[in-house]
A protein has these predicted regions:
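Membrane-proximal soluble regions of multi-pass membrane proteins
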Residues: 1-24
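C-terminal ends of transmembrane helices
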Residues: 18-23, 75, 95, 149-159, ...
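Solvent-exposed interhelical
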Residues: 146-180, 218-222
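Alpha-helical membrane-inserting segments
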Residues: 46-54, 67, 71, 123-127, ...
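Multi-pass membrane catalytic core of lipid/isoprenoid biosynthesis enzymes
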Residues: 29-46, 86-132, 136-137, 174-190, ...
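Membrane-embedded alpha-helical segments that form the functional core of polytopic membrane enzymes
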Residues: 34-84, 135-139, 196-216
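Acidic (Asp/Glu-rich) catalytic motifs at the cytosolic membrane interface
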Residues: 67-105, 212-233
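N-terminal beta-alpha supersecondary unit
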Residues: 9-12, 26-51, 165-169
Length: 250
């Protein structure tokens, strides 16, 4: 029962999928971050469904672009937009944290979101779907969430409030770090075995860059910054997927 509650908590927080509602408590939040990658698995399965449906090419590309947004409800895009505004302000740490708390969408967020979707749609249109490509992308969507959850359990927090702090405080951080680190290693190995080593390399490099930006710019991570990392990683892994396909590696 606790396992199901843990999964439900993860899906209730990180997706728009209707799930039974449980009150958050010490037991069902302890390993909720370990269930976070399952949201990526669902995104990948639906992405593959979109790939095999007899859709016109533009509709298929739009589906590839929108499936992750529909599944997650845009929660990570919200963090991406807020973080783009904060980092573009070039203010001090407190100024950036204040911008992250501001519910309004600034000019830089709008510009970056439009650019993001234009790039994502263009890359999605370039993907030639095959079962192997579907498997690679599903692994990638799971991997980015494994790294995101690992960061919440391992990186310093920028503040003592917010959802990232709530999940980090409630988690058995040692166990979560170990589980997600092992999962990330296995996923990277699977990507490499399928010819998608470039996707794993991109994810690892962005994970390291994420730590650098978080510590240098904000003194640690926040929920918004976690969303920014996930969306950045997804876009660049999609570019790597296209590059692998163009290069004949997959």
């Amino acid at each position: 029962m606790i396992v199901l509650q843990t999964i439900a908590v993860a899906f209730a927080m990180f997706s728009a999928v209707p799930v039974p509602q449980f009150g958050w408590n010490e037991k069902n939040m302890r390993y909720a971050l370990c269930a976070f990658p399952l949201v990526g698995l669902l995104c990948g399965v639906l992405w593959c469904v979109c790939g095999v449906l007899p859709l016109p090419a533009p509709a298929r590309a739009a589906g590839f672009c929108l499936v992750p947004v529909w599944v997650t409800g845009g929660i990570h895009l919200d963090g991406y937009a807020d973080t783009c505004d904060a980092l573009a302000s070039y203010g001090d740490r407190e100024k950036k944290l204040d911008i992250l708390k501001d519910p309004h969408c600034g000019a830089f967020a709008v510009i970056r979101l439009c650019s993001y979707f234009a790039a994502y749609l263009c890359l999605a249109a370039c993907v030639q779907f095959t079962p192997r490509v579907g498997a690679l992308w599903t692994l990638a969507l799971v991997l980015e969430r494994a790294f995101s959850g690992l960061a919440v359990a391992a990186f310093p927090m920028a503040k003592n409030t917010g959802l990232a702090h709530t999940f980090a405080s409630a988690a058995d951080r040692t166990a979560v770090r170990n589980v997600l680190a092992v999962l990330a290693i296995l996923l990277c190995g699977a990507l490499l075995a399928l010819g998608g080593g470039a996707l794993a390399a991109v994810a690892i490099l962005l994970f390291l860059w994420y730590h650098h930006v978080a510590v240098q710019q904000l003194g640690g991570i926040t929920g918004d910054l976690a969303g920014w990392f996930l969306q950045k990683t997804e876009l660049w892994m999609l570019a790597a997927l296209c590059a692998c396909q163009w290069g004949g590696l997959i």
